[in-house]
Amino acid sequence: MSKTRYYLEQCIPEMDDLVEKGLFTKNEVSLIMKKRTDFEHRLNSRGSSINDYIKYINYESNVNKLRAKRCKRILQVKKTNSLSDWSIQQRIGFIYQRGTNKFPQDLKFWAMYLNYMKARGNQTSYKKIHNIYNQLLKLHPTNVDIWISCAKYEYEVHANFKSCRNIFQNGLRFNPDVPKLWYEYVKFELNFITKLINRRKVMGLINEREQELDMQNEQKNNQAPDEEKSHLQVPSTGDSMKDKLNELPEADISVLGNAETNPALRGDIALTIFDVCMKTLGKHYINKHKGYYAISDSKMNIELNKETLNYLFSESLRYIKLFDEFLDLERDYLINHVLQFWKNDMYDLSLRKDLPELYLKTVMIDITLNIRYMPVEKLDIDQLQLSVKKYFAYISKLDSASVKSLKNEYRSYLQDNYLKKMNAEDDPRYKILDLIISKL
């Protein structure tokens, strides 16, 4: 009862303000207070549920909408610069806070809380949202969606790429075996570099000093007033995790210059993360499927290693599809890095000898890489011939079954992507391509 009375007493100045401004009558205010009393009793009872908090929030939201409408209609203004302008919104935030304290495991309610605070824009402090994320991450450090949400908030709202990178790396210390978090980290790095390159093109930023000043100004413009004092306090992983993932790039790595002078601007940061990702996911996959004790049966060990490579290969194909989306980057350079990765023997296995189906997939990607992004209108015959040369170089080293499989796939690729889209009568390239396909 004491809590209920205390919370209701906090409403009195707000109710007086609403009556004084002529926005609500005394009778309406009494009904609002009665409704709030009912909600407070429910919230403070032992049998309260998360739905009670949601209903209370919905009710307060409706009261605030009605207040805003009357403010515009009666007073002819959007704001009255008085207590009732912000008190209801503040109460809604407080109800959310109380709900998360009582039901800390309800992630949907946490998401509603965050969305509400973010939707308020400048009315919500950067520090407040940080505090919510801090609470969430301490309670749910193994939920990667929270880490991703937090990282995106830093970058997309505040253009704080250093903080975003730190959040991803801290998240990976807790969740090194989760592919989704690695994928989103790589995606962030590619988005960051793309945005940086395009911005510099538009603004004509050539020398490094201009680029550095622009980055500082952009971050300053997006910085909230209380951002400097607020830091994300991520939970500790303990001493055993301190040296793990130490191959990841530093948060303040230089991105000045151009792609010719700075490999970071070609996507090398993302590629470094890809390499660490493959190594880490592979290790955790093996540990998960065999435990931490060695398998004595060598045949079982080989099968597990093959299974691991299949798993990693499927993940690497997702990255190739991701690279396809970044039109402003050297996509063939990024994909070639993945192909080079698979040329190395791993877990005492070779793709070519032990997993020929996977090997043929890398071959197919390699021989079509230089024409991968050429639409039929821009197909260059010289580049096509280079692709064909690669094809013949590969089949000279393959067995007959593999040659047949690669031949069929390469032929279908050329027909579906180019030949069928050409005009046989008007396009001189048609006969050349048709002849090439017939000689494969």
Swiss-Prot record:
Residue ranges, annotated region (Disordered): 216-241
Keywords recorded for this protein, A-Z: Nucleus, Repeat, Ribonucleoprotein, Ribosome biogenesis, rRNA processing
Any one of the GO CC terms: 90S preribosome
Location within or outside the cell: Nucleus, Nucleolus
InterPro entries: HAT, TPR-like_helical_dom_sf, Utp6, UTP6_N
Family (UniProt): Belongs to the UTP6 family.
Its biological purpose: Component of the SSU processome, a pre-ribosomal particle required for the maturation of the 18S rRNA from the 35S pre-rRNA precursor.
Additional facts recorded: Present with 7520 molecules/cell in log phase SD medium.
Name of the featured protein: U3 small nucleolar RNA-associated protein 6
